[in-house]
Amino acid sequence: TRTINYEVPAGHAAIAPVTQTVEYTRDVNGVAGYQDPVTGEITWNPWHVKSGNAEFASAAVEQIKGYDSYVDGTKATEVPAAQVTEKDGVPQNGANVTVSYQKQGDTPVPYKPGQEGVDDDMNQYVTRTIVVHEPGKDPVSHDQTVHFTREDANGNAGYTDPVTGETTWNAWHVAGELNQANGTWAEFNAPTVKGYTASQAKVAAEEVTAETKNATIDITYAPVAPTGQNVTTKVGETPDADQGIANKGDLPDGTKYSWKTTPDVSTEGEKPATVIVTYPGGSTVEVPVTVTV
């Protein structure tokens, strides 16, 4: 006989040994041997194979997904045939065979660039959108995007385990920078608009990762607030309303000024009055002043 033993990987079900048998016999025409009538000694016929060849047949090795099989240390998928040997005319058992297994290497998953701006298993786009709302203009969006990929130095995005079929993805990094896990949204300075104050003069730079959520920031503009000042005039002379505003030069172009009620300049004295400031967008602000006549 020859026995094929299987050494399976940990966690795998055992594979039963396979025993190969080559049957020999002494039978020749129904006679196994002859006995000497004088001495009584029996002379046996030589052993010979009962049928077939005097060899252990080749045998296919049972395969395990994700592993390479080895026969007595040599990578192979079948146990080779082996001649039966004899010693002093007696057929001998064949050498036992050991089948072992080695796990195959992980299968590379090639990196694919994908579609610009579209997230997938291999690409991640992290975007900050800054929307600038300048007065009298359509909003303008400024996109700041950091592209992250999983591509390694070998052009692969990950590796698939041949046994489980699970893919382990490479860590995210900034596209083109293998060792840079973090990217940056750059600092953004809001446009300066005469007569208006931005809701924020700048948007600070920010470090981001592939897990950072997309963000949208709106920058709006409010007109500069008017500052009132007292006005001096002569009896009978009504001053222009804009004289009651100290910071006209800081206000938006096209701002208009009017008296809420025309001040009484018919007599001397300090007369309370109100200047109505009308911005280009139509909003108004009332500014209390004193008119000295």
Feature-to-residue mapping (PLM):
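Conserved "repeat-terminator" motif of extracellular CCP/Sushi domains
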Residues: 1-7, 78-127, 132-133, 205-225
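Short, solvent-exposed loop/edge segments of extracellular or virion-exposed proteins
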Residues: 3-33, 38-42, 74-79, 111-116, ...
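Solvent-exposed, low-complexity, repeat-rich "mucin-like" stalks and linkers
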Residues: 39-55, 164-184, 224-253
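Surface-exposed interfaces of beta-sheet-rich extracellular modules
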Residues: 44-88, 169-207, 257
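Core beta-strand segments of extracellular beta-sandwich domains
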Residues: 58-63, 99, 187-192, 219, ...
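Serine/threonine-rich, repeat-prone extracellular segments and beta-strand-based repeat modules
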Residues: 72-98, 199-218, 251-285
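Short, solvent-exposed loop/turn segments enriched in Ser/Thr/Gly
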Residues: 124-127, 237-243, 266-273
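C-terminal edge beta-strand
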Residues: 285-293
